[in-house]
């Protein structure tokens, strides 16, 4: 990886303002998912290092909390500016460790930076309340204060944005943080904290611990000094972490799995729906929590939509993320490839029609062909399992009530999409879909000013928006005798 600023490539963890190795001297290798090439390594840390990071965050808490909201905002603003100044290097680093096309990586860096900019300002607007007192000799006030030491466990699919979406509101609220990034993509996290240090974030305010996830996670969920955990990842792991946090009654934010439906009604703009479907399905090779898992297409437009969709998917360029023109990169690991293949095999064995793709790409490695399946019916695993790959599954429907019932028939409730030009239908369908986010006539829904999160088993809490900082605050009631 060729960077303009070589100091952004860090192969050590960051605890209390110092770059450090694991106590045992061991490390975890990091590879390019496109070709398996060795990129570098990071420390294989465990419980002892996690405890030191937690203690460092706790020691830094008083000083950071004592700064005014404006002072914290100035530091965060500088962090935001540094991300944009180094966006090309950060994008290159991400493409090589995560695999996504360079233009998508660059988009993620700007997206990640937007959360820092947003929450730098939101920290100045943590307002309280004055309550009219029922007693003449009392004055009742409500203030909000940062919750304290926070922990974040972040995924590999958005290795920069999932960190800033948690760290920015935490720091803006006066909290400190310990971050455990995914072992597949640690370099993005370490580059971010290198820039945070340059921006003036004091030692201990933000820490990154790499290594053994279960051991580190057990400390982040079990240590009494940690008052809040934020996790983005799978529902099974989120369920486990939530249970571990129960022992010390931690506040928990969870952004978990999805099973997003994409509905094309008979009055939809078909060309617009096809373009929206491409983005909502194949971005990041289908490896996002809000990627479409199930396409429901009305009988009246099924053939037309399917023909055009297959035509457009066939045009997608698969390759290394750094290559010009690449639209789809590799899956993250060989296990991901095997999972996608097993879901396709299950569907075709049960009668699905293979319209395009269906197997690992000729490029080898972790590349997989963009795939379209038709004739999907109940009982096929991919209707309930999160695919997390470049596979589109198409289902016919004939009425609004039928498709809403089908769309809601899942444990998940993160994102949903639909295309229609009937304004009455738009409101009715949007309100009836059991999802935390609904995209209407668009396949892109996320930004820093909107609340991101799901319902049911897709999670708890919201990230981004004016609501995102609330998860890092405690409400305190003051009763004054006068």
Please give the residue ranges for each predicted region.
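Rossmann-like NAD(P) dinucleotide-binding subdomain of oxidoreductase/dehydrogenase enzymes
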Residues: 128-272, 397
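ALDH superfamily catalytic-core signature
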Residues: 228, 236-377, 440
